[in-house]
């Protein structure tokens, strides 16, 4: 992910503490999700969401005077990191009226521009296990499924659902001066080592703060916050990408200045994290008709779809989709010597060889990334626009001086003049993304949890399961690879699974070698 959101406000408080204020009550919007077992039985979990601390009103502990206004700090309340943490506190959130965030049962809607006393742009939220703890997921050996509606997201917007290795308590146990914690959305980190965070590790980030030249609400401080990141879904109605980002140190850690690397630093590759990742964007890989708005695309983004991501114990990452009762595997990619549809070591090596760069492998690749997915990761759901690169890295030609003949440069059909945040906020303020029907469990468990129908769709009278062509073997017939499709209504590919796996029915339209 080239940048994780242009942020709005901050957090903290007394006695060098990161504490909470009481002028606005903090009530987390409820959100249910499902935990599934290997037999395909899923049980409802009662959760909630919390907005990130950077969006919150930060004011004096003894008054409503702003500690941070626009993109600058109060020189009186915040002359340095320690004094600022002592003088300022983080307040509660009016989720719907201020931030455009609403929930209903298992559905979360995030609006783009919300106008209340002030203008708010986008949001970043975390799934909660309790009122004071983020929900953690161990991805390795499991699969994660959700429904998403990106129909209202034009070029330049990013409805991102992803995981990061941030602390479940928001950093409270590591940094005792942080008493606000997960209840108020503290402790964020990602592979860009963001420096636009107002406070990190219970300390202010005011020293060295430089207000943004093109964003009236943000700036960059002297510190950043790093950790591993798994981008399950970065998407709008035009393009989508799946991207793991390893770090040499898995969990959250603070960094200094340009040595942070990432989007916010002069030396992009100077930090401990991989800012580029090993991405799987079907359009970038040459399949320009797989994903987009309208019936001419395999996946029609004018309609809701289900996204299922599987994390093999080998470290490989697999993906399939369901829409209108039809299951679609990730389309095959032909990249150098690589041919297949699994994001594995061979694919990532081929991508670096063909598209350039070595950041992913330099930071340990999938072997290092497994250290993150084998531990707890926090679920993040967001909507944002990009003041650094106009989201062209997701949905257009990037860098903009490249052409269609440059391998990997074309990532989507959007114009290189699209995605300008000021224009988006003016022309598409009502844009939104909706995430729903979250399920998590062992590989093969989430697709059969709705009474035998594919997740996210109703079984039509007659359907076919579309999949990319696979190579065929000699008699007695082709063999499907582990985790490949091996059956389903309308399916005509290999039905015999490779040694060590068997063909298991997940729903009438999709069977998989497990």
Swiss-Prot record:
Residues 1-17 form the signal peptide. The keyword Hydrolase applies. It comes from the Eukaryota. CDD domains: GH7_CBH_EG. Disulfide bonds join 21-89, 36-42, 67-88, 78-84, 155-414, 189-227, 193-226, 247-273, 255-260, 278-348, 486-503, 497-513. Residues 18-453 are annotated as: Catalytic. Keywords: Carbohydrate metabolism, Cellulose degradation, Disulfide bond, Glycoprotein, Glycosidase, Hydrolase, Polysaccharide degradation, Signal. Residues 401-427, 444-481 are annotated as: Disordered. It comes from Hypocrea rufa. GO terms for biological process: cellulose catabolic process. Pfam families: CBM_1, Glyco_hydro_7. GO terms for cellular component: extracellular region. Residues 454-478 are annotated as: Linker. The gene is cbh1. Residues 460-479 have a biased composition (Low complexity). InterPro entries: CBD_sf (IPR035971), Cellulose-bd_dom_fun (IPR000254), ConA-like_dom_sf (IPR013320), Glyco_hydro_7 (IPR001722), Glyco_hydro_7_sf (IPR037019). One of its GO terms (molecular function) is cellulose 1,4-beta-cellobiosidase activity. The biological conversion of cellulose to glucose generally requires three types of hydrolytic enzymes: (1) Endoglucanases which cut internal beta-1,4-glucosidic bonds; (2) Exocellobiohydrolases that cut the disaccharide cellobiose from the non-reducing end of the cellulose polymer chain; (3) Beta-1,4-glucosidases which hydrolyze the cellobiose and other short cello-oligosaccharides to glucose. Residues 478-514 form the CBM1 domain. Its EC number is 3.2.1.91. Glycans are attached at residues 62, 81, 287. Belongs to the glycosyl hydrolase 7 (cellulase C) family. This is Exoglucanase 1. The active site is at 229 (nucleophile), 234 (proton donor). It catalyses: Hydrolysis of (1->4)-beta-D-glucosidic linkages in cellulose and cellotetraose, releasing cellobiose from the non-reducing ends of the chains. PROSITE patterns: CBM1_1, CBM1_2.
């Amino acid at each position: 992910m080239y940048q994780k959101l242009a942020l709005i406000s901050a957090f903290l408080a007394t006695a060098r503490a990161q504490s909470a204020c009481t002028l606005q009550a903090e009530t987390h919007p409820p959100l249910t999700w499902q935990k599934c077992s290997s037999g395909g039985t899923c049980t409802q979990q009662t959760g909630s969401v919390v907005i990130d601390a950077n969006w919150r009103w930060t004011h004096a502990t003894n008054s409503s005077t702003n500690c941070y206004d626009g993109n600058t700090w109060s020189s009186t309340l915040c002359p340095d990191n320690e004094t600022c943490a002592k003088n300022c506190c983080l307040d509660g959130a009016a989720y719907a009226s201020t931030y455009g965030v609403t929930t209903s049962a298992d559905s979360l809607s995030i609006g783009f521009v919300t106008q209340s006393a002030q203008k708010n742009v986008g949001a970043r939220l975390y799934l909660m296990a309790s009122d004071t703890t983020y929900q953690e997921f161990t991805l390795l050996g499991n699969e994660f499924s959700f429904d998403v509606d990106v129909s209202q997201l034009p070029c330049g917007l990013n409805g991102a659902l992803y995981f990061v290795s941030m602390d479940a308590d928001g950093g409270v146990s590591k940094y005792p001066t942080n008493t606000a914690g997960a209840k108020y959305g503290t402790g964020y980190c990602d592979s860009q080592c963001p420096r636009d965070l107002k406070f990190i590790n219970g300390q202010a980030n005011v020293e060295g703060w430089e207000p943004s030249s093109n964003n009236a609400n943000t700036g960059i401080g002297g510190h950043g916050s790093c950790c591993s990141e798994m981008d399950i879904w970065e998407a709008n109605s035009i393009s989508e990408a799946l991207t793991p980002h390893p770090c040499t140190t898995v969990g959250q850690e603070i960094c200094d200045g340009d040595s942070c690397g990432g989007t916010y630093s002069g030396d992009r590759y100077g930090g401990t994290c991989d800012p580029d990742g090993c991405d799987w964007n079907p359009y970038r890989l040459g399949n320009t008709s797989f994903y987009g708005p309208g019936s001419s695309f395999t996946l029609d983004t004018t309609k809701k779809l289900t996204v299922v991501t599987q994390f093999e114990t080998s470290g490989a990452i697999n993906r399939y989709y369901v829409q209108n009762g039809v299951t679609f595997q990730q389309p095959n990619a032909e990249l150098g010597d690589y041919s297949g549809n699994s994001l594995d070591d061979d694919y990532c090596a081929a991508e670096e060889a063909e598209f350039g760069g070595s950041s992913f492998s330099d930071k340990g690749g999938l072997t290092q990334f497994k250290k993150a997915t084998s531990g707890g990761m926090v679920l993040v759901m967001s909507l944002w626009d990009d003041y650094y690169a106009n989201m062209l890295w997701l949905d257009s030609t990037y860098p903009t001086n490249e052409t269609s003949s440059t391998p990997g440069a074309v990532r989507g059909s959007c114009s290189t003049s699209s995605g300008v945040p000021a224009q988006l906020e003016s022309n598409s303020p009502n844009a939104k993304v909706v995430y729903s029907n979250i399920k998590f469990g062992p590989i093969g468990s989430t697709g059969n949890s709705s009474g035998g129908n594919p997740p996210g769709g109703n079984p039509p009278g007659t359907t076919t399961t579309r999949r990319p062509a696979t190579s065929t073997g000699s008699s007695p017939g082709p063999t499907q690879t582990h985790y490949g499709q091996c059956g389903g209504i309308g399916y005509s590919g290999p039905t015999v699974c490779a040694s060590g796996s068997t063909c298991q029915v997940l729903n009438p339209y999709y069977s998989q070698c497990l």
